Protein backbone atom coordinates (compact mmCIF):
# COMPACT_ATOMS: atom_id res chain seq x y z
CA UNK A 1 0.00 0.00 0.00
CA UNK A 2 1.39 3.42 -0.97
CA UNK A 3 2.08 5.86 1.85
CA UNK A 4 0.69 9.38 2.12
CA UNK A 5 3.22 12.05 1.15
CA UNK A 6 3.41 15.68 2.16
CA UNK A 7 1.72 16.87 -1.05
CA UNK A 8 -1.39 14.84 -0.08
CA UNK A 9 -1.95 17.08 2.95
CA UNK A 10 -3.76 20.41 3.19
CA UNK A 11 -1.12 22.58 4.87
CA UNK A 12 -2.30 26.19 4.51
CA UNK A 13 -2.60 27.87 7.89
CA UNK A 14 -1.91 24.58 9.69
CA UNK A 15 0.75 24.01 12.32
CA UNK A 16 2.83 21.36 10.56
CA UNK A 17 5.07 19.27 12.81
CA UNK A 18 7.97 17.73 10.92
CA UNK A 19 10.50 15.17 12.11
CA UNK A 20 13.69 15.90 10.18
CA UNK A 21 17.10 14.28 10.47
CA UNK A 22 19.54 17.00 11.48
CA UNK A 23 21.94 14.58 13.19
CA UNK A 24 24.98 16.31 11.66
CA UNK A 25 28.61 16.31 12.83
CA UNK A 26 29.43 19.43 14.86
CA UNK A 27 32.94 20.38 15.99
CA UNK A 28 33.57 23.44 18.18
CA UNK A 29 30.08 24.73 17.41
CA UNK A 30 30.60 24.43 13.62
CA UNK A 31 28.79 21.95 11.36
CA UNK A 32 31.43 19.97 9.44
CA UNK A 33 29.03 18.24 7.01
CA UNK A 34 25.56 19.65 6.36
CA UNK A 35 24.45 17.06 3.78
CA UNK A 36 21.48 16.01 5.94
CA UNK A 37 20.25 19.60 6.14
CA UNK A 38 20.55 19.96 2.36
CA UNK A 39 18.57 16.72 1.87
CA UNK A 40 15.79 18.03 4.12
CA UNK A 41 15.27 21.27 2.15
CA UNK A 42 12.73 20.11 -0.50
CA UNK A 43 10.14 19.14 2.13
CA UNK A 44 10.79 22.22 4.28
CA UNK A 45 10.53 24.57 1.28
CA UNK A 46 7.32 22.90 0.09
CA UNK A 47 5.65 23.35 3.51
CA UNK A 48 6.70 27.03 3.59
CA UNK A 49 5.36 27.60 0.04
CA UNK A 50 2.05 25.99 0.97
CA UNK A 51 1.58 28.40 3.88
CA UNK A 52 2.18 25.92 6.68
CA UNK A 53 3.45 27.05 10.06
CA UNK A 54 6.42 24.71 10.33
CA UNK A 55 7.69 23.23 13.61
CA UNK A 56 10.81 21.08 13.17
CA UNK A 57 11.98 18.29 15.47
CA UNK A 58 15.29 16.38 15.34
CA UNK A 59 17.72 14.56 17.58
CA UNK A 60 21.47 15.21 17.62
CA UNK A 61 23.91 12.64 19.00
CA UNK A 62 23.35 10.74 22.22
CA UNK A 63 22.49 12.63 25.39
CA UNK A 64 23.43 10.57 28.44
CA UNK A 65 24.17 13.21 31.05
CA UNK A 66 23.54 16.91 31.68
CA UNK A 67 27.06 17.87 30.52
CA UNK A 68 26.33 16.43 27.03
CA UNK A 69 23.75 19.14 26.37
CA UNK A 70 26.26 21.92 25.76
CA UNK A 71 27.81 20.38 22.64
CA UNK A 72 24.58 18.87 21.33
CA UNK A 73 22.29 21.86 20.96
CA UNK A 74 20.54 22.29 17.60
CA UNK A 75 21.29 26.04 17.61
CA UNK A 76 24.03 25.71 14.91
CA UNK A 77 21.49 23.81 12.76
CA UNK A 78 18.99 26.67 13.11
CA UNK A 79 21.67 29.13 11.95
CA UNK A 80 22.72 26.93 9.00
CA UNK A 81 19.11 26.32 7.94
CA UNK A 82 18.32 30.02 8.25
CA UNK A 83 21.10 30.86 5.76
CA UNK A 84 19.94 28.18 3.33
CA UNK A 85 16.30 29.30 3.43
CA UNK A 86 17.15 33.00 3.37
CA UNK A 87 14.79 33.63 6.29
CA UNK A 88 14.78 33.47 10.06
CA UNK A 89 14.46 30.07 11.69
CA UNK A 90 13.10 30.64 15.19
CA UNK A 91 15.09 28.49 17.61
CA UNK A 92 13.48 27.48 20.90
CA UNK A 93 16.05 26.06 23.35
CA UNK A 94 13.38 23.91 25.03
CA UNK A 95 11.68 20.61 24.21
CA UNK A 96 8.45 21.42 26.07
CA UNK A 97 6.79 24.11 28.15
CA UNK A 98 5.24 27.55 27.97
CA UNK A 99 8.05 29.20 26.00
CA UNK A 100 7.70 26.61 23.21
CA UNK A 101 3.89 26.69 23.23
CA UNK A 102 3.79 30.51 23.02
CA UNK A 103 6.34 30.57 20.17
CA UNK A 104 4.20 28.09 18.19
CA UNK A 105 0.99 30.06 18.87
CA UNK A 106 2.68 33.19 17.48
CA UNK A 107 3.78 31.59 14.19
CA UNK A 108 2.52 33.06 10.92
CA UNK A 109 2.03 31.18 7.65
CA UNK A 110 5.44 30.31 6.16
CA UNK A 111 7.30 30.70 9.47
CA UNK A 112 9.81 28.06 10.59
CA UNK A 113 10.60 27.06 14.17
CA UNK A 114 13.17 24.52 15.36
CA UNK A 115 12.66 22.76 18.70
CA UNK A 116 15.75 21.88 20.77
CA UNK A 117 17.33 18.39 20.49
CA UNK A 118 14.60 15.81 21.18
CA UNK A 119 17.11 13.60 23.01
CA UNK A 120 17.42 16.17 25.80
CA UNK A 121 14.26 14.34 26.94
CA UNK A 122 16.40 11.20 27.41
CA UNK A 123 17.93 12.67 30.57
CA UNK A 124 14.65 11.97 32.33
CA UNK A 125 14.11 8.22 31.89
CA UNK A 126 14.90 8.10 28.14
CA UNK A 127 11.48 9.51 27.29
CA UNK A 128 12.37 10.19 23.63
CA UNK A 129 14.26 6.96 22.87
CA UNK A 130 11.75 4.75 24.70
CA UNK A 131 8.76 6.41 22.99
CA UNK A 132 7.16 7.66 26.20
CA UNK A 133 3.42 7.84 25.35
CA UNK A 134 2.85 11.08 27.28
CA UNK A 135 5.72 12.84 25.48
CA UNK A 136 4.49 11.75 22.02
CA UNK A 137 0.98 12.89 22.93
CA UNK A 138 2.26 16.25 24.22
CA UNK A 139 4.30 16.98 21.08
CA UNK A 140 1.37 15.94 18.87
CA UNK A 141 -0.87 18.39 20.77
CA UNK A 142 1.30 21.26 19.47
CA UNK A 143 0.32 20.74 15.81
CA UNK A 144 -2.40 19.88 13.30
CA UNK A 145 -0.61 17.42 10.99
CA UNK A 146 2.69 15.52 11.05
CA UNK A 147 5.31 14.97 8.33
CA UNK A 148 8.03 12.37 8.91
CA UNK A 149 11.08 13.03 6.73
CA UNK A 150 13.69 11.38 8.99
CA UNK A 151 14.57 8.08 7.32
CA UNK A 152 17.77 7.93 9.40
CA UNK A 153 15.66 7.14 12.49
CA UNK A 154 12.88 5.16 10.75
CA UNK A 155 14.19 1.94 12.36
CA UNK A 156 13.71 3.46 15.82
CA UNK A 157 10.44 3.71 17.70
CA UNK A 158 10.85 7.14 19.29
CA UNK A 159 8.42 9.68 20.69
CA UNK A 160 9.35 12.19 17.97
CA UNK A 161 8.44 9.86 15.10
CA UNK A 162 6.14 6.97 16.06
CA UNK A 163 4.85 8.72 19.20
CA UNK A 164 3.60 11.80 17.34
CA UNK A 165 2.22 9.66 14.47
CA UNK A 166 -0.08 7.86 16.92
CA UNK A 167 -2.07 11.07 17.44
CA UNK A 168 -1.90 12.97 14.14
CA UNK A 169 -2.51 12.44 10.43
CA UNK A 170 0.97 11.52 9.17
CA UNK A 171 2.62 11.76 5.75
CA UNK A 172 6.12 11.07 4.45
CA UNK A 173 8.32 13.98 3.43
CA UNK A 174 10.00 13.93 0.02
CA UNK A 175 13.25 12.43 1.35
CA UNK A 176 11.39 9.64 3.14
CA UNK A 177 9.37 9.05 -0.04
CA UNK A 178 12.63 8.62 -2.01
CA UNK A 179 14.03 6.17 0.53
CA UNK A 180 10.83 4.09 0.43
CA UNK A 181 10.92 4.15 -3.37
CA UNK A 182 14.57 3.17 -3.82
CA UNK A 183 15.70 1.20 -0.76
CA UNK A 184 12.23 -0.31 -0.34
CA UNK A 185 12.18 -0.95 -4.09
CA UNK A 186 15.31 -3.13 -3.89
CA UNK A 187 13.58 -5.34 -1.34
CA UNK A 188 10.04 -5.39 -2.71
CA UNK A 189 10.15 -4.95 -6.47
CA UNK A 190 13.63 -4.67 -7.99
CA UNK A 191 14.31 -4.59 -11.69
CA UNK A 192 16.38 -7.68 -12.53
CA UNK A 193 19.23 -8.51 -12.79
CA UNK A 194 20.16 -7.29 -9.30
CA UNK A 195 23.76 -7.03 -8.09
CA UNK A 196 24.51 -6.29 -4.43
CA UNK A 197 27.95 -5.18 -3.27
CA UNK A 198 28.65 -5.61 0.43
CA UNK A 199 31.72 -4.46 2.32
CA UNK A 200 32.73 -3.15 5.70
CA UNK A 201 34.47 -4.86 8.56
CA UNK A 202 32.08 -7.44 9.96
CA UNK A 203 29.96 -10.28 8.63
CA UNK A 204 27.87 -10.01 11.82
CA UNK A 205 26.70 -6.50 10.84
CA UNK A 206 25.39 -7.78 7.51
CA UNK A 207 24.20 -11.35 8.24
CA UNK A 208 20.49 -10.53 7.99
CA UNK A 209 21.07 -8.38 4.91
CA UNK A 210 22.87 -11.30 3.22
CA UNK A 211 20.10 -13.74 4.24
CA UNK A 212 17.52 -11.47 2.64
CA UNK A 213 19.55 -10.50 -0.43
CA UNK A 214 20.27 -14.10 -1.50
CA UNK A 215 16.54 -14.29 -2.28
CA UNK A 216 16.65 -11.04 -4.30
CA UNK A 217 20.08 -10.54 -5.89
CA UNK A 218 21.47 -12.44 -8.86
CA UNK A 219 25.00 -11.76 -7.61
CA UNK A 220 26.41 -10.64 -4.25
CA UNK A 221 29.95 -9.23 -4.45
CA UNK A 222 31.68 -9.28 -1.07
CA UNK A 223 34.69 -7.10 -0.22
CA UNK A 224 36.02 -5.31 2.85
CA UNK A 225 37.12 -7.00 6.06
CA UNK A 226 34.04 -9.23 6.04
CA UNK A 227 35.27 -11.05 2.90
CA UNK A 228 38.07 -12.82 4.79
CA UNK A 229 35.71 -14.84 6.98
CA UNK A 230 34.27 -16.23 3.72
CA UNK A 231 37.75 -16.85 2.31
CA UNK A 232 38.72 -18.67 5.53
CA UNK A 233 35.51 -20.72 5.17
CA UNK A 234 36.87 -21.90 1.79
CA UNK A 235 39.83 -23.39 3.65
CA UNK A 236 42.31 -20.68 2.61
CA UNK A 237 44.86 -18.99 4.85
CA UNK A 238 44.14 -15.31 5.55
CA UNK A 239 47.12 -14.37 7.76
CA UNK A 240 46.23 -11.62 10.23
CA UNK A 241 43.22 -10.44 8.21
CA UNK A 242 39.95 -9.70 9.95
CA UNK A 243 38.16 -12.90 10.96
CA UNK A 244 34.98 -13.68 12.84
CA UNK A 245 35.51 -17.27 13.98
CA UNK A 246 31.90 -17.67 15.07
CA UNK A 247 30.66 -16.75 11.57
CA UNK A 248 32.71 -19.33 9.62
CA UNK A 249 29.87 -21.88 9.70
CA UNK A 250 27.42 -19.27 8.39
CA UNK A 251 29.86 -18.41 5.58
CA UNK A 252 30.38 -22.12 4.76
CA UNK A 253 26.63 -22.78 4.56
CA UNK A 254 26.11 -19.75 2.35
CA UNK A 255 28.91 -20.75 -0.02
CA UNK A 256 27.57 -24.33 -0.20
CA UNK A 257 23.96 -23.32 -0.83
CA UNK A 258 24.41 -20.08 -2.78
CA UNK A 259 27.96 -20.37 -4.10
CA UNK A 260 26.98 -19.42 -7.64
CA UNK A 261 25.63 -16.07 -6.39
CA UNK A 262 28.57 -15.11 -4.17
CA UNK A 263 31.64 -13.43 -5.72
CA UNK A 264 34.71 -13.05 -3.48
CA UNK A 265 38.01 -11.18 -3.96
CA UNK A 266 40.69 -12.88 -6.07
CA UNK A 267 43.54 -10.62 -4.93
CA UNK A 268 44.24 -8.12 -2.16
CA UNK A 269 46.66 -5.54 -0.82
CA UNK A 270 48.43 -6.67 2.32
CA UNK A 271 50.60 -5.02 4.96
CA UNK A 272 52.40 -5.96 8.18
CA UNK A 273 50.99 -3.08 10.17
CA UNK A 274 47.67 -1.25 10.32
CA UNK A 275 48.97 2.07 9.00
CA UNK A 276 48.66 4.22 5.89
CA UNK A 277 52.46 4.28 5.68
CA UNK A 278 52.86 0.49 5.80
CA UNK A 279 54.68 -1.25 2.95
CA UNK A 280 52.03 -2.52 0.51
CA UNK A 281 52.19 -5.80 -1.37
CA UNK A 282 49.62 -7.02 -3.89
CA UNK A 283 49.04 -10.78 -3.71
CA UNK A 284 46.63 -13.44 -4.93
CA UNK A 285 43.96 -14.32 -2.37
CA UNK A 286 45.68 -17.74 -2.05
CA UNK A 287 49.01 -16.21 -1.01
CA UNK A 288 48.37 -14.13 2.12
CA UNK A 289 51.38 -14.75 4.44
CA UNK A 290 50.78 -15.56 8.11
CA UNK A 291 52.33 -12.30 9.39
CA UNK A 292 50.34 -9.86 7.19
CA UNK A 293 46.75 -8.69 6.88
CA UNK A 294 44.59 -7.78 3.90
CA UNK A 295 43.76 -4.06 3.91
CA UNK A 296 42.05 -3.61 0.52
CA UNK A 297 40.87 -5.57 -2.49
CA UNK A 298 43.38 -5.71 -5.34
CA UNK A 299 43.14 -4.47 -8.96
CA UNK A 300 42.09 -7.89 -10.35
CA UNK A 301 39.16 -7.96 -7.92
CA UNK A 302 38.13 -4.44 -8.97
CA UNK A 303 38.22 -5.71 -12.57
CA UNK A 304 36.21 -8.83 -11.65
CA UNK A 305 33.58 -6.82 -9.75
CA UNK A 306 33.34 -4.37 -12.66
CA UNK A 307 32.69 -7.29 -15.02
CA UNK A 308 29.97 -8.68 -12.72
CA UNK A 309 28.24 -5.28 -12.67
CA UNK A 310 27.81 -5.09 -16.44
CA UNK A 311 24.23 -5.71 -17.51
CA UNK A 312 22.78 -5.17 -14.03
CA UNK A 313 19.52 -3.20 -13.89
CA UNK A 314 19.60 -2.67 -10.12
CA UNK A 315 22.76 -2.21 -8.05
CA UNK A 316 22.83 -1.69 -4.29
CA UNK A 317 26.12 -1.01 -2.48
CA UNK A 318 26.74 -0.98 1.26
CA UNK A 319 30.18 -0.88 2.85
CA UNK A 320 33.73 0.02 1.72
CA UNK A 321 36.07 -2.50 0.08
CA UNK A 322 39.04 -1.83 2.34
CA UNK A 323 40.42 0.50 4.99
CA UNK A 324 39.05 3.48 3.08
CA UNK A 325 40.15 6.03 5.70
CA UNK A 326 43.78 5.26 4.72
CA UNK A 327 44.33 6.81 1.28
CA UNK A 328 46.78 4.04 0.27
CA UNK A 329 44.08 1.43 0.87
CA UNK A 330 41.18 3.32 -0.69
CA UNK A 331 41.70 2.28 -4.30
CA UNK A 332 39.40 -0.73 -4.10
CA UNK A 333 36.52 1.39 -2.83
CA UNK A 334 37.27 4.11 -5.40
CA UNK A 335 37.42 1.52 -8.20
CA UNK A 336 34.08 -0.04 -7.27
CA UNK A 337 32.53 3.41 -6.86
CA UNK A 338 33.71 4.39 -10.36
CA UNK A 339 32.42 1.13 -11.86
CA UNK A 340 28.93 1.67 -10.43
CA UNK A 341 28.91 5.37 -11.34
CA UNK A 342 29.63 4.53 -15.00
CA UNK A 343 26.68 2.14 -15.38
CA UNK A 344 24.20 3.79 -17.74
CA UNK A 345 21.10 1.60 -17.70
CA UNK A 346 20.96 0.70 -14.02
CA UNK A 347 19.23 2.04 -10.94
CA UNK A 348 22.21 2.53 -8.61
CA UNK A 349 21.70 2.87 -4.88
CA UNK A 350 24.08 3.38 -1.98
CA UNK A 351 22.74 2.15 1.33
CA UNK A 352 24.06 4.97 3.49
CA UNK A 353 26.93 4.94 5.99
CA UNK A 354 30.58 4.78 4.92
CA UNK A 355 29.84 4.03 1.25
CA UNK A 356 27.71 7.17 1.00
CA UNK A 357 30.50 9.23 2.58
CA UNK A 358 32.99 7.67 0.14
CA UNK A 359 30.89 8.44 -2.96
CA UNK A 360 30.24 12.02 -1.83
CA UNK A 361 33.90 12.70 -0.96
CA UNK A 362 34.97 11.28 -4.35
CA UNK A 363 32.56 13.57 -6.19
CA UNK A 364 30.33 10.77 -7.55
CA UNK A 365 27.23 12.02 -5.77
CA UNK A 366 25.37 12.95 -8.97
CA UNK A 367 26.25 9.68 -10.73
CA UNK A 368 24.10 7.52 -8.46
CA UNK A 369 20.33 7.22 -8.68
CA UNK A 370 20.01 7.44 -4.91
CA UNK A 371 22.34 7.83 -1.94
CA UNK A 372 20.54 6.88 1.25
CA UNK A 373 20.69 9.14 4.30
CA UNK A 374 20.23 6.22 6.69
CA UNK A 375 22.97 3.95 8.01
CA UNK A 376 21.25 1.53 10.38
CA UNK A 377 17.84 2.27 8.84
CA UNK A 378 19.07 1.32 5.35
CA UNK A 379 20.55 -1.93 6.65
CA UNK A 380 17.37 -2.92 8.48
CA UNK A 381 15.27 -2.05 5.41
CA UNK A 382 17.57 -4.24 3.28
CA UNK A 383 17.05 -7.01 5.84
CA UNK A 384 13.40 -6.95 4.80
CA UNK A 385 12.18 -5.55 8.12
CA UNK A 386 9.18 -3.27 8.41
CA UNK A 387 10.56 -0.07 9.91
CA UNK A 388 8.44 1.43 12.73
CA UNK A 389 8.84 5.00 11.44
CA UNK A 390 7.52 4.01 7.99
CA UNK A 391 4.79 1.73 9.34
CA UNK A 392 3.42 4.69 11.36
CA UNK A 393 2.91 6.83 8.21
CA UNK A 394 -0.71 6.76 7.01
CA UNK A 395 -1.55 4.80 3.88
CA UNK A 396 -3.05 6.74 0.97
From Swiss-Prot:
Record carries keyword Glycoprotein: no
Subcellular location per UniProt equals: Cytoplasm
* A Gene Ontology BP annotation from the UniProt entry: glycolytic process
Could you tell me the keywords of this UniProt record?
ATP-binding, Cytoplasm, Glycolysis, Kinase, Nucleotide-binding, Transferase
Q: State the superkingdom.
A: Bacteria
Is the keyword Transferase in the record?
A: yes
Which EC numbers characterise this protein's activity in its record?
A: 2.7.2.3
Entry's Gene Ontology molecular function annotations: ADP binding; ATP binding; phosphoglycerate kinase activity
Question: Where on this chain does substrate bind?
Answer: 21-23, 36, 59-62, 119, 156
Family per record:
Belongs to the phosphoglycerate kinase family.
**How does the record describe its quaternary structure?**
Monomer.
What is this protein called in UniProt?
Answer: Phosphoglycerate kinase
The record lists the lineage as: Bacteria, Bacillati, Bacillota, Bacilli, Bacillales
Amino acid sequence: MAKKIVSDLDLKGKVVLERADFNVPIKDGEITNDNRIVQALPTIEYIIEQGGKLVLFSHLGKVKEESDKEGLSLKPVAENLSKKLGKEVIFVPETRGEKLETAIENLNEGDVLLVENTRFEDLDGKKESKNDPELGKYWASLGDVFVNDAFGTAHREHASNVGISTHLETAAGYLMEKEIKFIGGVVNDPQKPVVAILGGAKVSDKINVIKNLVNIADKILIGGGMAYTFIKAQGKEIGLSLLEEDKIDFAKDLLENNGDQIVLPVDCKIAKEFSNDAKITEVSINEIPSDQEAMDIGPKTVELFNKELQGAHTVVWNGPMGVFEFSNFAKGTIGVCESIAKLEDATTIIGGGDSAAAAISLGFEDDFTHISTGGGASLEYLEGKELPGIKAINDK
